[in-house]
Amino acid sequence: MLVDDEESIQLLYREEFEDEGYIVDSAYNGSEALAKFRENPPDLVVLDINMPGMNGIEVLRQMKELQANLPVILSSAYQEYKQDFGSWASEAYVVKSANMDELKATVRKYLG
């Protein structure tokens, strides 16, 4: 599942991951992501941190309460968040749009 409020990021990530053979579900905000998560839990989540309403850290916390072993990759345009990601119980942190190969390699690490 891809959770990001920016349409351009949604389109880029969706195209890249579908080209890799993944089925991509997406949500534009935390509430939508949690509703979809409860209906059909994904195998992995790529999650933006800065979103209107519920931020990515709160979404991460709620998803982990429901499924502790869910791999979550935090994604943000802000490099400074990278130093904090370990305290947020995510599996990885990738700077948004900086390196698509890094994000794809991280996803492959968890999904094969």
Mark where each language-model region is.
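Active-site residues of response regulator receiver
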Residues: 48
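Charged docking surfaces used in two-component/phosphorelay signaling
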Residues: 11-19
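Alpha4 helix (beta4-alpha4-beta5 surface) of REC/receiver domains from two-component response regulators
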Residues: 58, 78-96, 100-105
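Acidic catalytic/metal-coordinating carboxylates
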Residues: 29-32, 55-58
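Conserved phosphotransfer cores of two-component systems
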Residues: 38-40, 62-69, 86-88
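Hydrophobic/aromatic residues positioned on beta-strands within the core alpha/beta folds
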Residues: 73-75
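Receiver (REC) domain active-site loop signature in two-component systems and cognate sites
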Residues: 51
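Short hydrophobic/Thr-rich beta-strand motif most characteristic of the beta2 strand and flanking loop
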Residues: 21-28, 36
